[in-house]
């Protein structure tokens, strides 16, 4: 089953947080990097990713650093906590089904 061209905002937020948590090593990365290195996001429009990054930043889940050439993002401590909470709830759901 192919992924739909447009993913839900919630799923997109989760995928971005997961990538920043798992792959960035605490290093800030650009929106271009996010859009090209996360397979699920390659079909998403740039303005949509920008809006989602803004939402994540407004909720203090990511931190941005603005430079003359680009804006770079990294996950915040609050974002790490939220991501781990979401993952534990997800795993709990599947463990409950299994038992």
Can you say where each PLM-predicted feature lies in the sequence?
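Short alpha-helical segments that sit at the start of domains
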Residues: 1-25
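Short acidic, hydrophobic short linear motifs in intrinsically disordered regions
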Residues: 26-38
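Residue at a beta-strand N-cap/secondary-structure junction
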Residues: 26-28, 43, 72
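Short amphipathic alpha-helical interaction segments
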Residues: 42-58
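A short, conserved structural fragment
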Residues: 57-67
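Short, cationic-aromatic polyanion-contact patches
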Residues: 67-88
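Amphipathic alpha-helical dimerization/coiled-coil segments
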Residues: 85-99
